[in-house]
Amino acid sequence: MEEMLQNRNKLLLDILQEEKSSGYAGGIYHKTQIELTYNSNHIEGSSLTHEQTRYIFETNTIGVEDGSLNVDDVIETANHFRLVSLIIDNAKSTLTQEFIKKLHLLLKNGTSDSRRDWFVVGDYKKLPNEVGGMHTTPPEEVSGKMKELLDEYNAKEEKSLDDVLDFHVKFEKIHQFQDGNGRV
């Protein structure tokens, strides 16, 4: 059963990479980009609709009929599409702290956060933060905790879905960035 799941995961990655390379619209890569980006950003409070998210992915433009849009929502949406592509391109590579920081830089580059003196883009947080009233790992402990997490994860030859989920839960608990942890 485990071997069958591993083969399915390899097949899925092959399909994602092939559709990404070919620019095929309407396939699993197209749907994954839109759904993952919309839902990840929506959880974080993005004001963009599913339709606006899809339109940004498909046309790199956005139309607004009524009201206004938060520019950071648009920038982070466009950046998230590039982030997902980079993850797909590097899915078979060893996961490193440098790569994770690169993903954060890609996500937050050009946002108002990137212009704040206290906000670190592309590196771990310098100030303590909390999520839903729960304290996260103190800044001075983040690098060590990330090293432990990555050493544990990278030691596994074949990663199962449970391994990925376990990694994600631990990653979120560390909460190494000032913002953007879940989307990274």
Language model segments and positions:
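FIC/Doc superfamily catalytic core
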Residues: 1-184
